[in-house]
Structure formats: structure tokens, C-alpha cells
Amino acid sequence: MKVSQVFISAISVFGLATSVNAQNASNTTSNAAPALHAQNGQLLNAGVVGAAVGGALAFLI
């Protein structure tokens, strides 16, 4: 496995973990604005897409 593959995978996992943490934080805050929930939902989606793309790139590189 190349260094670039490990690097891409690490970034993907970090992005996913960060977005999940943001989503959980907004869910536990009762007075959070709806816009904040929507933004964190987009972050979560970006993390999932990033992980998928990173995984695909790891096979291609």
C-alpha cells in the first residue's frame, strides 16, 4: 500500500469523524437553529462522500 493511499484514507476517516461529531453535537443542543442542523447534515454527507471517494482513489492509485 502506497503512502498516498494511507494519506487519503486518513483524511477521509478524519473528515467523517469530524462531521459525525458535529452532527451529534447539534442533535444534543435543544435550542440549535435549524440552519445549524442543515449545515451539519451537509458536513456529514461530505464526510461520507469523502470516505467513499478516498476509498475509490486508494484502489486506483
UniProtKB/Swiss-Prot annotation:
Glycosylation sites: 24, 27
Keyword Signal appears in the UniProt entry: yes
KW Signal (keyword) present: yes
Main function: May play an important role in the response of cells to diverse environmental stresses.
Keyword terms of this UniProt record: Glycoprotein, Signal, Stress response
Induction section of the entry: By multistress. Expression is controlled by the MSN2 and MSN4 transcriptional regulators.
Protein family membership: To yeast HOR7.
Note: Present with 784 molecules/cell in log phase SD medium.
Signal peptide from the UniProt entry: 1-22
Cellular component GO terms, alphabetical: cytoplasm; fungal-type vacuole
BP GO annotations: cellular response to heat; cellular response to hydrogen peroxide; cellular response to starvation; DNA damage response
Protein name stated in the entry: Protein DDR2
